Amino acid sequence: MAQFGGQKNPPWATQFTATAVSQPAALGVQQPSLLGASPTIYTQQTALAAAGLTTQTPANYQLTQTAALQQQAAAAAAALQQQYSQPQQALYSVQQQLQQPQQTLLTQPAVALPTSLSLSTPQPTAQITVSYPTPRSSQQQTQPQKQRVFTGVVTKLHDTFGFVDEDVFFQLSAVKGKTPQVGDRVLVEATYNPNMPFKWNAQRIQTLPNQNQSQTQPLLKTPPAVLQPIAPQTTFGVQTQPQPQSLLQAQISAASITPLLQTQPQPLLQQPQQKAGLLQPPVRIVSQPQPARRLDPPSRFSGRNDRGDQVPNRKDDRSRERERERRRSRERSPQRKRSRERSPRRERERSPRRVRRVVPRYTVQFSKFSLDCPSCDMMELRRRYQNLYIPSDFFDAQFTWVDAFPLSRPFQLGNYCNFYVMHREVESLEKNMAILDPPDADHLYSAKVMLMASPSMEDLYHKSCALAEDPQELRDGFQHPARLVKFLVGMKGKDEAMAIGGHWSPSLDGPDPEKDPSVLIKTAIRCCKALTGIDLSVCTQWYRFAEIRYHRPEETHKGRTVPAHVETVVLFFPDVWHCLPTRSEWETLSRGYKQQLVEKLQGERKEADGEQDEEEKDDGEAKEISTPTHWSKLDPKTMKVNDLRKELESRALSSKGLKSQLIARLTKQLKVEEQKEEQKELEKSEKEEDEDDDRKSEDDKEEEERKRQEEIERQRRERRYILPDEPAIIVHPNWAAKSGKFDCSIMSLSVLLDYRLEDNKEHSFEVSLFAELFNEMLQRDFGVRIYKSLLSLPEKEDKKEKDKKSKKDERKDKKEERDDETDEPKPKRRKSGDDKDKKEDRDERKKEDKRKDDSKDDDETEEDNNQDEYDPMEAEEAEDEEDDRDEEEMTKRDDKRDINRYCKERPSKDKEKEKTQMITINRDLLMAFVYFDQSHCGYLLEKDLEEILYTLGLHLSRAQVKKLLNKVVLRESCFYRKLTDTSKDEENHEESESLQEDMLGNRLLLPTPTVKQESKDVEENVGLIVYNGAMVDVGSLLQKLEKSEKVRAEVEQKLQLLEEKTDEDEKTILNLENSNKSLSGELREVKKDLSQLQENLKISENMNLQFENQMNKTIRNLSTVMDEIHTVLKKDNVKNEDKDQKSKENGASV
């Protein structure tokens, strides 16, 4: 792939092929490769580096020497073992056991001791890295490397397969040992296969041990001694084999071991219950992987500036000395240790943190040569693009894009344009009359165009830059701008891309193309119209991007001899976005293609149904036929369509379809009738009925399947004629061109850059060369944008001086306040208060030192996780404050109250800072950085940014570049998010645009010939032309045209929004009207019910009155009847009493 500098291997594959750690000059030897020896040594070194044991203090110097002896002995044993075993088995599944008696170690001859530990100056942990042996194939640049061994992180894991670093595919069957989980670091052996869907496939995967261990678990369980046999390290899970004596004789000397024999070695890690001492292990023993940004990316070509890494840095030495002082002070003060353990704040900080996200791999790729080169020959092409096939006739190329897009007028992305390639079945609405190969075609000149399709500038920002205000889902799905910028190319065959164009014709295009530039433009318009149907005559600007020259030998073409000549191929880059149809034109085109589909369907329907006139005449005759003709008298293959339909209709079968379908249907029916007769002869009526039922079910199934297939075909054809919603330039490829193999395709810039040596066609070479030049043009433009932004930044020294002045003023004010306080009474209280303040100040300083020391390891990891919150300016100020620490401590004692107040207010300020919403204010600068930072790490290394500035063709000196980089670079990195993003509160602040006048670097300082100056003076007057007797300024007209185009695009966008809003309003109005109708209907029903209820109420009231009157009458009648009953009863009682008296009187008389 061209992006990887002529190598097919991605950057992660070559990332670990660096040389070993540099050694001091006193030793004169180099550390052997750890991975080449054994995975055991690799894991030991990794574990020690992660635990922080490689930081060599005077107290544990002998301890590290002991570990070095063990590592070198095991490495030598593993190297010998690799000579007698298979390579893969020796790399992963070797179980070695190194046991050597004490006498053997003492009687070895004296040789140099290879070790990775410095004997002069202790090195910090961050500088001890794992190096891998450079494969033999890397020494030969002509042979691409097919195999890599590296360490990576498992990013995806499924049931049977997974991915390492998002690129390397592996199956679980290739895993050796413990099955890895997502986020685990693994040792990978991968091979490259370009024919597979995933180019890199892992052959073996092995999980690196000692991951996710608890803080209290020691990394080494058994403390080894110097002279004792080296026991197998059970912690790492890999054993070693016995080592022969001859190998140790070649590596270990008695003289080098003698100093180590005088003292008894102590264990690497003490037990947890022991108190603090010189060999006390660090408090935070957490195995954390090194940040990905610490690893240098692979250069596109072999690096030549390695000496910069060997220069000692005085700042690093000062920070190392300060770290040593802090460590000694901690070891001397056990009380501080106890107070730190009892501090609740430290307990909160020791709580298990959240799972660390996978840091993206640092990937920065750019061309490592000057980008202002106007020409190139075969050797220069071969040097620049090692993967590019160069045709045999090529001898020169002119890069005219340098003049077409100078630094003062760069190319502007963001002009929305898209293409829509139509199916070969769909015909163009307008007839194409362009001629591709005229009879007088001359091969001296060829004109070809590269048509760009690009999203709008707003879409580019959101899809590629991951703006600060975008949601997290959109920021995670970013794409590189090279994937969003696409080109319309022709396809000859399967995978052969070609630029669209053809040869010059004197009769159609005009004579003398060398003097008249419009001749080749006419050639490009004609050939593009003939091949794609796109009319480029609407384009207003034609940029001459490149000229490629071939030396053609004498040949015979179409029966005539063509002498040897030079063929010049001119690649044009027109503003094709002006050919984009407007919204109204797009709607007209959409209706036209739909109408074309309707007409085609009607014509096919007429052809399928036959002549409708004959069908109408024969309708009556078909109805009269009631009995079908006997099957033995019919021959379906010789019958006409009308006869076939009559026979089918008489048999109650479908008569629709083509003639072949009718013949098949009738033939099948006749066979069924023949079978029926045979069955009737056998008198099997029951079976005949069953067969009839089966036949009907089969016919129904066939009819349903036929209808379903017809519906699918209809929908497929309709999709070919339906245009998308967004306007695009319609492409109708000329299917008859290039021997019927021509087609068109839309390919992104990254795909065009992914060429191979196998693409050995001349037209593919032209497309690949254009892609490289276009990519270099974008690199130059984005690099110049970064350069301008660095020029606009203020100098860092001015800011330091202002800060120092402000600090001095603050100190004077505070001293005056203290003098005022001394004049006040209450001396006893002030004295006691001063003593108390001094004690609190000492405690506060101790806590501050502990807090800084304990959070040292956390800062490095948090830098990767919180890169957006990293402030290079503030960190630089912190370094300056550390340099003046003695003076600062004096002022801190006097400013105790201010410090306490600051410590109380600091958490609230941090919370407010976290809550503040960031917003991107400089989107152009962010896109410029993102174009180089392909993995969105958020920073660029200093050496990469320096080389980018050198490639711009500004002829800058090293001092000038260093001065620019000092403004933004911190710890060898430039965190560009601090230059492009800010909080919403600071959004309205205007940027300081005090840009320097000299934006072209040192180009104006170079001597220029007088001829070029005269030509420039002549070209300045070319912009004025005489048209209809008036002088016309072409430049101003073009500017007005661009403005009008922008206004038109904005108006169309607003119109589209208004149409959408109108549609929504119509829908809401329709819904409101429907709801109004329903509510009015309900209202009428409610009124009707109300009137009915009122009538019922009146009726019930009348009935109530009637009932009351009737009851009153009844009551009166009852009262009269009761009175009469009472009177009658009284009369009866009187009569009974009279009778009783009479009877008594009669009895008495008797």
Curated annotation (Swiss-Prot):
Keywords: Activator, Apoptosis, Cell cycle, Coiled coil, Cytoplasm, Isopeptide bond, Phosphoprotein, Repressor, Transcription, Transcription regulation, Ubl conjugation
Modified residues (Phosphothreonine): T627, T667, T861
Cross-link Glycyl lysine isopeptide (Lys-Gly) (interchain with G-Cter in SUMO2) mapped to chain: K1012, K1067, K1135
Pfam family, one: S1-like
Annotated stretches, region: Interaction with AR: 1-249
Chain ranges of the SAP domain: 636-670
Annotated GO biological process: apoptotic process; positive regulation of apoptotic process; positive regulation of cell migration; positive regulation of cell population proliferation; protein ubiquitination; ubiquitin-dependent protein catabolic process
Ranges in a coiled coil: 594-618, 1033-1114
Compositionally biased residues, Low complexity: 134-146
GO cellular component, one term: perinuclear region of cytoplasm
Domain of life assignment: Eukaryota
Molecular functions per Gene Ontology: RNA binding; RNA polymerase II cis-regulatory region sequence-specific DNA binding; transcription coactivator activity; transcription corepressor activity; ubiquitin protein ligase activity
Phosphoserine PTM positions: S456, S685, S697
Keyword Coiled coil applies: yes
Subunit structure: Directly interacts with ESR1, NR3C1 and p53/TP53. Interacts (via N-terminus) with CALCOCO1. Interacts with MED1. Interacts with GATA1. Interacts with AR and GATA2.
Physiological role: Associates with components of the Mediator and p160 coactivator complexes that play a role as intermediaries transducing regulatory signals from upstream transcriptional activator proteins to basal transcription machinery at the core promoter. Recruited to endogenous nuclear receptor target genes in response to the appropriate hormone. Also functions as a p53 coactivator. May thus play an important role in transcriptional regulation. May be involved in apoptosis signaling in the presence of the reinoid CD437.
Identification of the protein by name: Cell division cycle and apoptosis regulator protein 1
Species the sequence originates in: Homo sapiens
Gene: CCAR1
